[in-house]
């Protein structure tokens, strides 16, 4: 998550994919990359989207349990919500979400369900 939200090249690729109606798939903290679409005064292209994201409440605890070496410098869910995203999960669980061409999974626990959802969605389209 560190560095990717500030990378204008990531934002360019994501805007290109959205313009081409291609699917974007993220897991856990992956939606942090979506923040890059808002760089250089560009509008945030995922405003009003629903998604599952690793919860900020769990990020606050991860250094204590050894998941991360230190505290996150900012709160991902908070930033996404401030940009108009509707976070549909509260826990770091196996929940997934699909909204338009964006497919998301809440945490590593969602990897299997996310893979199934992505595969089935791509096969249908």
Task: Describe every region a protein language model picked out.
Residues 1-25, 29-125:
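Active-site-adjacent pocket-lining segments in enzyme domains
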């Amino acid at each position: 998550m560190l560095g990717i939200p500030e990378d204008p090249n990531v934002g360019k690729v994501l805007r290109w994919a959205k313009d081409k109606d291609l699917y974007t798939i993220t897991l856990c903290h992956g939606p942090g990359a979506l923040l890059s679409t808002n760089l250089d005064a560009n509008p945030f292209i995922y405003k009003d989207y629903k998604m599952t994201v690793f919860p900020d409440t769990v990020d606050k605890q991860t250094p204590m349990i050894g998941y991360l070496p230190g505290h996150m410098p900012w709160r991902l869910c908070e930033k996404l919500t401030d940009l108009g995203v509707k976070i549909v999960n509260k826990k770091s669980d196996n929940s997934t979400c699909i909204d338009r061409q964006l497919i998301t999974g809440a945490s590593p626990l969602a990897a299997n369900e996310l893979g199934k959802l992505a595969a089935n969605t791509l096969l249908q389209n």
